[in-house]
Amino acid sequence: MYSVDLHMHTVASTHAYSTLHDYIAQAVARGLRLFAITDHGPEMADAPHPWHFMNMRVWPRTVNGVGILRGIEANIKSRQGDIDCHGRMLAEMDVVIAGFHEPVLAPVDRAFHTEALLATIARGEADIISHPGNPKYPLDIPAVARAAAEHGVALELNNSSFSHSRAGSADNCRTIAAAVRDAGGWLSLGSDAHIAFDMGNFNHCIRVLNEVNFPPERVLNASPRRVLDFLQRRGRPVIPEFADW
C-alpha cells in the first residue's frame, strides 16, 4: 500500500545493524520504490561523522529500480529549535528529519518542548518531525500540528514507537494523527528501522490512520512522486534522476 519509507538507520549509527546494500535488497524484496537513509545527526554519541553525510553524493540514485534519498535524522538541540545539520552538510541532504533525543536534549517540560518544536518547524531546515508522540517530550499537540501545516512540514507516525522504542506513545500518536487531519497537514510514516527486516513495516501506523479516518491524500508515503513534490515545495533541489518518477 505504501511504497516509500522515509526513516531508517544503517551501521553508520552503531546501534543499528544493516548496511545500505542490505536496505536496497530488502526494498526490492518488499516492493518499495523509494527510501531514505536517515542516520542520526553527529551530536548523538554513536552517530556518523559529518563527512558521512557530505559524502553521500557517491551513492547511486537508483539500484534495481529502487530510488535512494540521502537524509539525516537530526537532533533538536535547544529551545531555539536549532539542529545539528547545517551549512554544506545540510545542502547535501535530500530530506531532513529532526526530533528530540535524550542524549542530546534531555526532557524539560511541555512548554519548553512545544516552543522548541515550533521553532524547529519555523526555521525551515527540517522537512519532517520524527516521533513527536514520544511521551517523554509532552507537547501542545494541536499547536504543533497547526504550525506544521502552516509551514508545510510533515509530522511522523513512527512505527517503532508502538513496539521497540518510546513506550507509551500510542495514545499521543493517535492524537497527533487526528490533529494533523484537522489542521490539513501532512503525515509521514517511518519504520525507523534499525535492521533491514523492519524496513517498510507500517502496520501500527496504518491502524492509527484507520482509527482516525486520516485522509489518504495527506500521507506522504503513497508514492515517490508525492514525496518528491513535497520536498520540492519545501525548496529542496530537483533530483534529475527522478524527474520522470
UniProtKB/Swiss-Prot annotation:
One of its GO terms (biological process) is bacterial-type flagellum-dependent swarming motility. Keywords: Hydrolase, Metal-binding, Zinc. Its cofactor is Zn(2+). Zn(2+) 3 binds at residues 73, 101, 131. SMART domains: POLIIIAc. InterPro entries: Phosphatase_YcdX_put (IPR023710), PHP_dom (IPR004013), PHP_phosphatase (IPR050243), Pol/His_phosphatase_N (IPR003141), Pol/histidinol_Pase-like (IPR016195). One of its GO terms (molecular function) is zinc ion binding. HAMAP family: YcdX_phosphat. This is Probable phosphatase NT01EI_1577. It comes from Edwardsiella ictaluri (strain 93-146).
